[in-house]
């Protein structure tokens, strides 16, 4: 009920495109499709896949959906001679298109921090998260589409940072923000990626301090001031 509607939706679009002679396809997935068990020190897009059955057992159904969708799309593209590129993002920062997007992460908890309220966490998680700026992500999509030699999976993130480093950077931007309680144990190492394929697309991506600052400043500009936050458009 959760997985197949997304998979079938993707395949229906690819099937319709194939009927019209479309040979170049780019789809958006997630880094959650590249989490092998057991974990590896440095992940890459070629060798490392999540186990969708393991994801379902862990009730990570959205992540499992991405894994199944990618495998089905790759099979369909091969059978129909389509050049398929798959971009794998995680946390997407920067300007959004619609007011309703402000209700999702990370914008909703950044808005809370700007307002002096509690953000996403009461306590800093001993974990890391991967991030990219939406404009850079769009550039990766265009680069993959326009380069006739590109195909396969590409990470769509700048890098991964531990949450304590993310909050420390945000405090530089928002000195009076409400900080979550600190971790009391040694921090785990952030996820590490092999970005050689991503970099082959030739897109220069904003670093994490820059994308955090630009996102906060954009939210502070009240971009949807004529429309109340929360209204769906």
Question: How would you describe each model-predicted region?
Answer:
Residues 79-82, 94-110, 143-154:
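Glycine/proline-rich active-site loop of Rossmann-fold NAD(P)-dependent oxidoreductases
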Residues 1-62, 85:
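Conserved Rossmann-fold NAD(P)-dependent oxidoreductase catalytic core, especially the SDR/UDP-sugar
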Residues 62-70:
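Active-site YXXXK catalytic motif of short-chain dehydrogenase/reductase
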Residues 105, 122-143:
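Substrate-positioning beta->alpha
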Residues 29, 69-96:
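Conserved beta-loop-beta element that borders a ligand/cofactor-binding pocket
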Residues 33-34, 92-94, 137:
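Conserved sequence/active-site signature of Rossmann-fold short-chain dehydrogenase/reductase
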Residues 128, 138-187, 215-219, 223-233:
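Mid/C-terminal beta-alpha module of Rossmann-like enzyme folds, strongest
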């Amino acid at each position: 009920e959760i997985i197949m509607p997304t998979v079938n939706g993707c395949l229906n679009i690819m099937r319709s495109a194939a009927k019209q002679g479309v040979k170049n396809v780019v789809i958006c997935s997630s880094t959650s499709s590249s989490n092998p068990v057991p974990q590896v020190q440095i992940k890459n897009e070629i060798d490392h896949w999540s186990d969708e059955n393991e994801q379902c057992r862990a009730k990570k159904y959205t992540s499992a959906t991405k894994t199944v969708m990618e495998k089905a799309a790759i099979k369909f593209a091969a059978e129909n001679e389509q050049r398929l590129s798959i971009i794998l993002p995680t946390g997407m920062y920067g300007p959004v298109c619609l007011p309703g997007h402000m209700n999702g992460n990370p914008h909703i908890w950044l808005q809370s921090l700007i307002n002096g309220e509690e953000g996403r966490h009461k306590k800093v998680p001993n974990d890391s998260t991967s991030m990219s700026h939406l404009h850079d992500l769009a550039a990766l999509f265009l680069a993959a589409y326009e380069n006739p030699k590109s195909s396969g999976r590409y990470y769509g993130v700048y890098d991964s940072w531990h949450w304590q480093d993310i909050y420390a950077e945000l405090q530089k931007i928002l000195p009076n923000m409400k900080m979550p309680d600190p971790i009391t144990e040694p921090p785990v190492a952030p996820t590490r990626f092999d970005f050689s394929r991503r970099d082959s697309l030739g897109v220069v991506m904003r670093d994490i301090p820059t994308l955090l600052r630009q996102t906060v400043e954009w939210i502070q500009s009240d971009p949807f001031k004529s429309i109340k936050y929360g209204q769906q458009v």
